[in-house]
Swiss-Prot record:
Name of the featured protein: Probable aminotransferase ACS12
Modified residue annotations for N6-(pyridoxal phosphate)lysine: 334
Tissue specificity of this protein: Expressed in roots. Expressed at low level in leaves, stems, flowers and siliques.
Gene expressing this chain: ACS12
Chaperone listed as a keyword: no
InterPro entries: Aminotransferase_I/II_large, Ethylene_sulfur-biosynth, NHTrfase_class1_PyrdxlP-BS, PyrdxlP-dep_Trfase, PyrdxlP-dep_Trfase_major, PyrdxlP-dep_Trfase_small
Enzyme class: transferase
Cofactor: pyridoxal 5'-phosphate
Gene Ontology terms describing biological process: biosynthetic process
Record text on subunit structure and interactions: Homodimer.
Pfam families: Aminotran_1_2
SUPFAM superfamilies from the UniProt entry: PLP-dependent transferases
Gene3D superfamilies, sorted: Aspartate Aminotransferase, domain 1, Type I PLP-dependent aspartate aminotransferase-like (Major domain)
Length: 495
């Protein structure tokens, strides 16, 4: 009661202020003193485990489990089980070199060309710096490459691309730069088109065999599926309307919504060139079914046969069809042999597709410095005409040597007229005419013959024994080495 009275005095404002404030402080002090005396003495720090402190502090969270990434990233992070990527990775571990590693794996799985590097080397050495000089006085202007530029590509580059594409396609079609979006290679081009033309879970019809990279380019982020349209060697793997109809009906029965048709012309991996009639049939079919058409024409300038190349842009511009459903992919990786420049094109007659692609290019635009170089390169008409003539001739010559070498071994190839590869029939070397037999041969080629060739299984070919062999990065002296390795492997099967 004596303790409470002074406190009450404080509350009521009537005296006892000092005593009422002092008593609680004293009580708190004596309580601390009592607890301190009864506290056990501290342990010697040297008795503590050495591994305690930071290590133990962080290890306490281990029971929670490993931090997770998104469900989108998990399948992308996993190693691919496609023979196409398996072969490419194996070559990296033991690459062939005619001087330093003559027993290494020879790369026939990558469609790139070194045939005209001498011409590119000369042009770059003479024009590279000048192509970056943007001022009238010839001085370097940093603002021309350092400032923000349109994500869809500089207008000068789109104009140069339009002229270049028309030139390599025989001048039979003109391209409008306003329908064009510059991309960082063909991969972003196909992905952006898939994003624009199909919803997640929709599908594209795609004739087989097809380029294995399409699975990666389309499925990784867009969620769009690919439905194979099976073609056969009896038609030189050329797509037909009946095959498209059958694939579409089967897709609808499974509940899949088909949004378009995707194909390569010239075909990759076969190398055949689609005729004007076939292109009309495809577009007519798409119009009847109200779906889109995506024509990958990245090998348009790598045609070396007698057949005429016809762009789908020419068919769309004939006036017979609804051209807004036509979209074209192009790039410089193959025809100009500069995949490292990462330069591609989306060409579309659909205004919404072009506008959407322009905005999406903020994620994969081409560096301005590269664009400046390409403007000069593509605008050099004299160089381009000489280069393309040499490019086609050198592909033709290399193709003849490679196919003739296989022919002498009794190994035929499909008829082709474009691309940096040939479609080789190795079914005579199979231990069993099946997918399993083909994969066994793929492994033997890789480990015994030390040759990486892409098996048809990776391209969704339904006929076992076909392999894609890319030959435009080979030196002439490499071809006899390849043929000898295949010969020895074939003889080991017979013994």
């Amino acid at each position: 009661m004596r303790l409470i009275v002074p406190l009450r005095g404080v509350i009521q404002g009537r005296g006892g202020l000092f005593v009422g404030s002092l008593i609680p402080c004293c009580l708190f002090y004596f309580l601390q003193l009592y607890l301190k005396r009864r506290r056990p003495p501290p342990s010697d720090p040297t008795d503590l485990p050495r591994t305690f402190s930071r290590t133990n502090l962080f290890s306490r969270g281990n029971s929670i489990g490993r931090v997770r990434v998104s469900s989108r990233a998990v399948p992308v992070a996993k190693p691919s089980d496609s023979p196409y990527y398996i072969g490419l990775e194996r070559v990296k571990t033991d690459p062939y070199d005619r001087i330093t590693n003559t027993d290494g794996i020879i790369q026939l799985g990558l469609a790139e060309s070194t045939l005209c590097f001498d011409l590119l080397q000369r042009w770059m050495s003479e024009n590279l710096m000048e192509s970056m000089m943007q001022s009238d006085d010839g001085e370097f202007d940093i603002s021309s490459i350092a400032m923000y530029k349109p994500f869809e590509g500089l207008l000068e580059l789109r104009v140069a691309f339009a002229d270049f594409m028309s030139r390599i396609m025989g001048g039979n079609v003109s391209f409008d730069p306003s329908n064009m979006v510059i991309t960082a290679g063909g991969t972003p081009a196909i992905e952006v088109l898939a994003f624009c033309l199909a919803d997640h879970g929709n599908a594209f019809l795609i004739p087989t065999p097809y380029y294995p990279g399409f699975d990666r380019d389309i499925k990784f982020r867009t969620g769009v599926e690919l439905i194979p349209v099976h073609c056969r060697s009896s038609d030189n793997f050329t797509v037909t309307v009946s095959a498209l109809e059958q694939a579409l009906n089967q897709a609808r029965k499974r509940g899949s919504k088909v949004s378009g048709i995707l194909f390569s012309n010239p075909s990759n991996p076969v190398g055949n060139i689609l005729s004007r009639e076939t292109l009309c049939d495809i577009l007519r079919f798409a119009q009847e079914k109200n779906i889109h058409v995506i024509s990958d024409e990245i090998f348009a300038g790598s045609v070396y046969g007698d057949k005429e190349f016809v762009s789908m842009a020419e068919i769309a511009g004939s006036g017979e069809f609804d051209k807004t459903r036509v979209h074209i992919i192009y790039g410089l990786s193959k025809d100009l042999s500069i995949p490292g420049f990462r330069a591609g094109v989306i060409y579309s007659f659909h205004e919404d597709v072009v506008n959407a692609a322009k905005k999406l290019m903020r994620f994969s635009s081409v560096p301005v410095l590269v664009q400046r170089i390409l403007i000069s390169l593509l605008s050099d008409v004299r160089f381009i005409e000489g280069y393309m003539a040499a490019h086609r001739q050198r592909i033709r010559d290399k193709h003849i040597r490679f196919v003739e070498g296989l022919k002498q071994l009794g190994i035929p190839c499909a008829e082709s007229g474009g691309g940096l590869y040939c479609w080789v029939d190795m079914s005579s070397l199979l231990t069993s005419y099946s997918e399993k037999g083909e994969l066994e041969l793929f492994e033997k080629l890789l480990t015994v013959a030390k040759i990486n060739a892409t098996p048809g299984t990776a391209c969704y070919c339904i006929e076992p024994g076909w392999f894609r062999c890319c030959f435009t990065a080979l030196a002439d002296e490499d071809i006899p080495v390849i043929m000898e390795r295949i010969r020895q492997l074939a003889e080991s099967f017979r013994s």
